[in-house]
Curated annotation (Swiss-Prot):
This is Autophagy-related protein 16-1. Belongs to the WD repeat ATG16 family. It is found in: Cytoplasm; Preautophagosomal structure membrane; Endosome membrane; Lysosome membrane. GO terms for biological process: autophagosome assembly; axonal transport; corpus callosum development; defense response to virus; dendrite arborization; hippocampus development; macroautophagy; microautophagy. The WD repeats are required for non-canonical autophagy but not for canonical autophagy. The WD repeats are required for the recruitment of LRRK2 to stressed lysosomes. Residues 230-242 are annotated as: RB1CC1-binding. Widely expressed. Expressed in the testis and sperm midpiece (at protein level). Homodimer. Homooligomer. Heterooligomer with ATG16L2. Interacts with WIPI1. Interacts with WIPI2. Interacts with RB1CC1; the interaction is required for ULK1 complex-dependent autophagy. Interacts with ATG5. Part of the minor complex composed of 4 sets of ATG12-ATG5 and ATG16L1 (400 kDa); this complex interacts with ATG3 leading to disruption of ATG7 interaction and promotion of ATG8-like proteins lipidation. Part of the major complex composed of 8 sets of ATG12-ATG5 and ATG16L1 (800 kDa). Its main location: cytoplasm. Residues 207-230 are annotated as: WIPI2-binding. A motif (Caspase cleavage) lies at residues 296-299. Signal peptide: none annotated.
Amino acid sequence: MSSGLRAADFPRWKRHIAEELRRRDRLQRQAFEEIILQYTKLLEKSDLHSVLTQKLQAEKHDMPNRHEISPGHDGAWNDSQLQEMAQLRIKHQEELTELHKKRGELAQLVIDLNNQMQQKDKEIQMNEAKISEYLQTISDLETNCLDLRTKLQDLEVANQTLKDEYDALQITFTALEEKLRKTTEENQELVTRWMAEKAQEANRLNAENEKDSRRRQARLQKELAEAAKEPLPVEQDDDIEVIVDETSDHTEETSPVRAVSRAATKRLSQPAGGLLDSITNIFGRRSVSSIPVPQDIMDTHPASGKDVRVPTTASYVFDAHDGEVNAVQFSPGSRLLATGGMDRRVKLWEAFGDKCEFKGSLSGSNAGITSIEFDSAGAYLLAASNDFASRIWTVDDYRLRHTLTGHSGKVLSAKFLLDNARIVSGSHDRTLKLWDLRSKVCIKTVFAGSSCNDIVCTEQCVMSGHFDKKIRFWDIRSESVVREMELLGKITALDLNPERTELLSCSRDDLLKVIDLRTNAVKQTFSAPGFKCGSDWTRVVFSPDGSYVAAGSAEGSLYVWSVLTGKVEKVLSKQHSSSINAVAWAPSGLHVVSVDKGSRAVLWAQP
């Protein structure tokens, strides 16, 4: 520290350290000051005795010399003087011995004091080092304290800003909520008015149609009456019903009035219903029963009568989508093939012979397709998507009919129930939702506790496969789990045999299992040395007669197992260059289609 600085200019802790050093100096100096003074006096006395000793030694050597020079001198040395000198020498010798002893003690004391001083010097150095370290620590702590104060101020400012923003958002939310309520009320009122107007319009159209029908009927009756006045030749074997005119003498004369009027009445009874159906179709409100049955399901047969063939060759290879293909499904009549991919589209293909011809594309999804399902009539197509929604299209006109939103995660599977009027969807948000297509609302939401990867349905039960390695069986009439079955890996896919008595599962432990639903036990397990499940949504399938199961592997091979023996029936490879995501077996039993993580789809058949 500079001597020019005043004590008040130093911080308090520096003044405290200086005072402690001065106090320690005073204590240590007072303790050793007397010793040092005595030691100094002893040194001086020792030096004096050394000088006297040297002088006496010199005199001792001089006296014999003088005695030899003057041995006859009687007055110089006498007996008393010799005796006195001897006593003096003995005394000096004793004093010298005592001085040497004290000198040794003082030397040892000096050594001890030097050791103590060295120890104190070391302690002083250590204390100075600690003081320097403490000073550095204090400086760092002051810097940290300053930084923390700055951060605290920044956090207080940020917190205040967030609080202001929260208050503003709360006010905005309250206003928007009120606006939403008013908008909902207005929308409900508009819907009510719209429905009333539509009812009035329908009544008006029905009335006009009835008037038109009456006019046409009256005109037709008039024409028939005029035609009845003219005689018509009738052959004996003609099957037109003959009406006998009781006022005529010619009983053989016939008239077609009765037959024609019956046919006309039948034709006139149709327009009203057809007109109402067309009005309903304009607004996309056709019911499931109002859709005509497609031609491709007219030739379907029971599973027992199908000629199921294990495919052996790739009959047709094509790029189905621009990117990964996640789902594939045949229509109930095997004529249409639907594929869904990450390009957000569902594509329809017509499968005939050994080829697939592109028919059209179903658009409307905002993210990749994860699952595809036809209804039992093949008139509707249901697709689940990564945009948290499921959608329904009509197959005949490719129109989007319904969008089912409500999940908070991507929808991984959606299936029709057997009545085709309800839908079950499973999502990554760990919930299952039951939808009613008549009211177009979600009627039930069930929390499963784990992400749902696939769903299959029977009349009264929904089976779901989950990320937590469990298959859950749900009662549709309640929201409870009837039972659970845990496997060794995450469940990726489920499928039912045609009789709906056996459940096929695929899991990430590279095993396929057939579970007997009547005994709730694993009936058969399928595996192969080269088979490996490629993803968490790898789909597997039963054959239409339930005799085989098919699944795609991560290396791009298609495996077919026999349910009866549990052995691999066929391995089809060399067509896919990436992992197979899904497999579909045509209801006719003649074709199998596999799709992969690339863009490729392969139609397999037996020549």
